[in-house]
C-alpha cells in the first residue's frame, strides 16, 4: 500500500502550448489504474462479484503492466485479500470505480515527460440524467492519481469522461455527438468550442464525430463502447447485421461516417467490424442483488450495452470482455486478426457490464512517455 505524495502542481498553461499531447493507447505504458468497486446501489452483493472480476482483470493486465488500484480507506484490508499481490493499493476515496472517466488523461512531450489533464466530472449528467449523487469524491480522483506519479496537472474547463474520447496519437480524436453534445454535459458550449478545448488539451486537430453510441449505454453513448482506433488509419466498430435490432441504425450511421472521412494525416480509414454479443439482458437474480440508493436502479429484463469494442490495449496485450459463449470465440478470433502482434486475453466480464460499463471503462492507462 502506498501513501500520497505532495499534491500535483496545477499548471496555468495548456498542453498544446507546452508541446504535450495524448498518446494513443498502444503507446508504451508504465501503469494502468483501476478503482475498487463497492457501491451497493450499483454493484450486486455490495460489489462482491465485481471485486472478484476486477481482480481477474488486474491479473490479466498485471502480466504486462503494473496495476495501481484506488481504494477507500475502509476497504483497504478487504482489497488486500481479494486483489493479486502485484497490485499496488493506494488510498483514494471515490464515489464509484470508473477509472476511465474519473482518472486523468496523461499527456506526454517529445522528451518523454508526463503531465496529466484533470477534466470536470458530473457523474454522466449531473442533475440532468446523471447516474448517482453526490460525485464530489470522484472529482478529486484524477488529482490523487497524478500526485501518486508526481505529475503536474492541467485543470481543463470542460466536463468530460475519458470514455468519451479516443485518439490515434497522430492528431485525430474520435467521439460521439450523443455524449459530448448532450445538454447534460457542457450546455453552454458549442461543438466548435468543445473542439477548440479538446485541441488545446489533447493536442489534436481533426475530429471524427459519430452520431450515437451503443443502444442503452447509460453514459449517453461513450465512444469507447462503440468504436476505437486499432492503429493509425484503422478502427474497430461494434456491429450487428440484424437490421431489426435497435443497435443497427446506430452502428450503420457510424460506419457511413467512418467510410467517408479521413484522419488528421489525410488517410482514409480501414473499418474492422466486431459483432455484438447477445443481445444480453439483466436477470431477476442480478437485479435483486442491487440495493436501493441514489444510483440508477437495475431492472430485470433491461437490455445491457454489451460490446467487445470495450477492451484495453496495454503494452503487448489486448484485454477484452467475455460476455456471451455464442460470440466470445468469434470476437477473440476477430481481435487476433486485427491485432496479429498482440496477445489476446479474454476475461469473464458480465459483472462489470451489470454495473454499466466494461474493461476499458474501469481502467486508465498511464503512458511511459520515455
From Swiss-Prot:
Its EC number is 3.5.3.12. InterPro entries: Agmatine_deiminase, Peptidyl-Arg-deiminase_porph. SUPFAM superfamilies: Pentein. One of its GO terms (molecular function) is agmatine deiminase activity. The active site is at residue 361. Keywords: Hydrolase. GO terms for biological process: putrescine biosynthetic process. It catalyses: agmatine + H2O = N-carbamoylputrescine + NH4(+). It is an enzyme of class 3 (hydrolase). Transmembrane segments: none annotated. Residues 1-19 have a biased composition (Polar residues). The keyword Membrane does not apply. Gene3D superfamilies: L-arginine/glycine Amidinotransferase, Chain A. Residues 1-20 are annotated as: Disordered. Coiled coil: none annotated. The keyword Ubl conjugation does not apply. Belongs to the agmatine deiminase family. NCBIfam families: agmatine_aguA, PRK13551.1. This is Putative agmatine deiminase. It comes from Shewanella frigidimarina (strain NCIMB 400). The lineage of its organism: Bacteria, Pseudomonadati, Pseudomonadota, Gammaproteobacteria, Alteromonadales.
Amino acid at each position: 500500500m502506498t501513501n500520497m505524495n505532495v499534491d500535483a502542481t496545477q499548471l496555468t498553461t495548456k498542453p498544446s502550448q507546452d508541446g504535450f499531447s495524448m498518446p494513443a493507447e498502444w503507446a508504451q505504458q508504465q501503469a494502468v489504474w483501476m478503482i475498487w468497486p463497492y457501491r451497493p446501489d450499483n454493484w450486486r452483493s455490495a460489489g462482491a462479484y465485481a471485486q472478484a472480476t476486477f481482480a481477474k482483470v488486474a491479473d490479466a493486465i498485471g502480466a504486462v503492466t503494473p496495476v495501481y488500484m484506488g481504494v477507500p480507506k475502509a476497504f483497504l484490508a478487504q482489497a488486500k485479500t481479494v486483489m493479486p499481490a502485484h497490485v499496488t493499493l493506494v488510498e483514494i476515496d471515490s464515489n464509484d470505480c470508473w477509472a476511465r472517466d474519473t482518472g486523468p488523461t496523461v499527456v506526454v512531450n517529445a522528451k518523454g515527460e508526463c503531465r496529466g489533464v484533470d477534466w470536470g466530472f458530473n457523474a454522466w449528467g449531473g442533475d440532468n440524467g446523471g447516474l448517482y449523487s453526490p460525485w464530489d469524491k470522484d472529482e478529486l480522483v484524477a488529482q490523487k492519481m497524478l500526485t501518486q506519479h508526481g505529475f503536474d496537472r492541467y485543470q481543463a474547463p470542460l466536463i468530460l469522461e475519458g470514455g468519451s474520447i479516443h485518439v490515434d496519437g497522430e492528431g485525430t480524436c474520435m467521439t460521439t455527438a450523443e455524449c459530448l453534445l448532450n445538454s447534460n454535459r457542457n450546455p453552454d458550449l458549442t461543438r466548435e468550442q468543445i473542439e477548440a478545448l479538446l485541441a488545446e488539451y489533447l493536442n489534436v486537430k481533426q475530429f471524427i464525430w459519430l452520431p450515437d453510441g451503443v443502444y442503452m449505454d447509460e453514459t449517453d453513448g461513450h465512444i469507447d463502447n462503440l468504436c476505437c482506433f486499432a492503429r493509425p488509419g484503422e478502427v474497430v466498430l461494434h456491429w450487428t447485421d440484424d437490421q431489426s435490432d435497435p443497435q443497427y441504425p446506430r452502428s450503420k450511421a457510424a460506419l457511413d461516417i467512418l467510410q467517408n472521412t479521413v484522419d488528421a494525416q489525410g488517410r482514409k480509414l480501414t473499418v474492422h467490424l466486431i459483432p455484438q454479443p447477445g443481445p444480453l439482458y439483466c436477470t431477476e437474480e442480478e437485479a435483486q442483488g442491487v440495493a436501493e440508493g441514489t444510483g440508477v436502479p437495475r431492472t430485470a429484463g433491461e437490455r445491457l450495452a454489451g460490446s467487445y469494442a470495450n477492451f484495453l490495449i496495454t503494452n503487448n496485450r489486448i484485454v477484452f470482455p467475455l460476455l456471451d459463449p455464442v460470440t466470445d470465440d468469434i470476437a477473440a478470433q476477430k481481435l487476433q486478426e486485427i491485432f496479429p502482434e498482440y496477445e489476446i486475453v479474454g476475461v469473464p466480464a458480465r459483472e462489470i457490464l451489470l454495473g454499466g460499463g466494461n474493461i476499458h471503462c474501469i481502467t486508465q492507462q498511464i503512458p511511459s512517455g520515455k
